[in-house]
Design a protein with these regions (language model features):
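N-terminal transmembrane alpha-helices
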Residues: 5-42, 56-71, 75, 100-107, ...
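Hydrophobic transmembrane alpha-helices of multi-pass small-molecule transporters
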Residues: 60-63, 175-179, 204-209, 281-284, ...
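Helix-terminus/linker motif at the lipid-water interface of multi-pass membrane proteins
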Residues: 26, 30-49, 118-125, 181-188, ...
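Transmembrane helical elements of multi-pass membrane transporters/channels
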Residues: 16-35, 137, 148, 171, ...
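Short alpha-helical transmembrane segments in multi-pass integral membrane proteins
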Residues: 1-18, 76-141, 185-241, 297-362, ...
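Small-residue-rich hydrophobic transmembrane alpha-helices
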Residues: 48-108, 145-164, 271-335, 366-380, ...
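Interfacial/gating helices of multi-pass transporter permease domains
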Residues: 39-59, 125-130, 190-193, 232-239, ...
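Short runs within selected transmembrane alpha-helices of multi-pass transporters and secretion channels
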Residues: 69, 137-156, 164-172, 193-208, ...
């Protein structure tokens, strides 16, 4: 099933495409959050802190792989918009072969480096063994992470954002069930949560492959899955590397902040872990709207419909703004109730509420940065997204270090460091956006 986004009313197209992306990511966050909830409820505070401090490294690896797939998706969208089916086939087969080799090597490297990376993050020695075991299990399953993200990104590039959602919903339910079985029944602790996550991702891959063979003729390549195009690989690496580095840079900034949080005590670590998961729920739809803008713009750019590129950007920014206001109200008002879903300790809940209520006041800022990044990805200028993300994270980490290590501020220092990063990011992106729109005024 494919969806031609070069025709039809833009706002309904964006909304219909975005909703499955949002739901899919919310389900993914749900089964990630299930690890924290179940570990926090059934294992204890130390295990929750270990899972939380492992999460930035785990997410870094996953986002790096996802970034490579996102870069490929932009090229597939452009080729599909231009009607070049043969190019779509070569792009998909080349990425599948190269990605398999890369993800296996990357998985082995991550398993080997798990301990020194956690030590670099200043993880307390009493929870280090728990964190190492959790990470190694997740890292061992990165091949499944690649294939799911690759197949899902390809289907989204063809305009189908619904199919991957259905697979992810099934996988999420199984992951939560697996968490309960491995942790509560078998008493495997955080290792059981990690194993459940890997099994769920493997199932997602199988379901995607079966669906593609049944429903997506353009991807039923047969022997053409073995086609490897070196020239396409170079272009794929160029797009994929920029996108992967952008995703990785964001996560490296989070890791730097996590290292600072690790100096603030186990209660603050646990509160930050739970509050960050909630913040991810709020923030992810903003990214999804940006990704929907990217797909729409890339398809229309490939088709030469530049007027729809500008219309797509303006519609997307309006959607981002409305969502930013709504989620800020929900997170500010519902912070105490939401925190109680994750933990029972009153001190941890209090700290988490303070974090959430502070950061929610500024949710319009990442809404706009994500919309602008979606625009630049869609027009093929991934350098802007990489540089702006790098600037954001450098200033965020530096501000967190000053606020916490030098000024000795408490948990509110962390969301204020986010604001510093967003302000600098917008200061970089806005002039470039205005310059691009003016220089392409005849086309747009």
């Amino acid at each position: 099933m494919t969806n031609d986004m070069t025709k039809g009313a833009i706002t309904p197209l964006l909304i219909r495409f975005t909703i499955p992306l949002v739901l899919g990511n919310l389900f993914q966050l749900t089964y990630n959050a299930a690890d924290s909830i179940i570990v926090g409820k059934f294992v204890g505070e130390e295990a929750l802190a270990a899972v939380g401090t492992s999460n930035p490294l785990m997410t870094l690896a996953i986002l790096f792989i996802n970034g490579m797939c996102l870069g490929t998706g932009i090229l597939v969208s452009t080729a599909f918009g231009a009607g070049d089916t043969r190019l779509v086939e070569r792009q998909v087969s080349t990425t599948a072969i190269a990605g398999t080799v890369f993800s296996l090597a990357f998985s082995a490297l991550c398993v080997i480096l798990a301990t020194p990376l956690l030590q670099l993050m200043q993880v307390p020695t009493d929870i280090l063994p728990i964190a190492v075991n959790y990470l190694r299990i997740v890292f061992a399953g990165l091949i499944f992470t690649f294939f799911y993200n690759f197949l899902a990104a390809t289907m989204r590039a063809l305009g189908d954002s619904k199919s991957a959602l259905y697979f992810l919903m099934i996988s999420s339910v199984l992951n939560i069930g697996g968490d309960l079985f491995f942790v509560e029944v078998l008493n495997w602790g955080s290792n059981g949560c990690a194993l459940s996550t890997v099994i769920s991702e493997a199932l997602c891959c199988v379901l995607c492959v079966l669906y593609i063979r049944w429903k997506v003729p353009i991807l039923q390549l047969g022997r053409r899955w073995l086609v490897f195009d070196g020239s396409l690989l170079r272009k794929t690496v160029s797009y994929g590397w920029a996108s992967a580095m952008q995703q990785a840079t964001v996560q490296l900034g989070k890791i730097a902040v996590q290292a600072i949080v690790n100096t603030m005590g186990v209660s603050t670590m646990a509160a930050f872990t739970a509050a960050s998961r909630i913040d991810d729920f709020a923030y992810t739809p903003q990214q999804n709207i940006g990704h929907a803008m990217t797909t729409l713009m890339a398809q229309n750019r490939g088709a030469g419909k530049h007027d729809r590129v500008k219309q797509g950007f303006l519609c997307g920014m309006r959607i981002e703004g409305v969502y930013g206001v709504l989620i800020a109200v929900v997170c500010f008002g519902g912070a105490p109730f939401i925190m109680k879903l994750f933990v029972t300790d009153p001190e941890v809940i209090h700290l988490g509420v303070r974090f959430l209520r502070t950061v929610s006041l500024f949710y319009l800022m990442p809404a706009f940065t994500n919309g602008i990044q979606g625009f630049f990805r869609g027009v093929g200028d991934l350098k802007v997204t990489l540089v702006s993300s790098t600037i954001n994270m450098l200033f965020r980490a530096a501000a967190a270090a000053v606020f916490v290590l030098m000024w000795k501020l408490e948990i509110e220092a962390l969301p204020y460091s986010y604001v510093v990063g967003w302000v600098v990011m917008l200061a970089y992106e806005l002039p470039l956006l205005v310059r691009y729109l003016r220089s392409h005024e005849d086309e747009l």
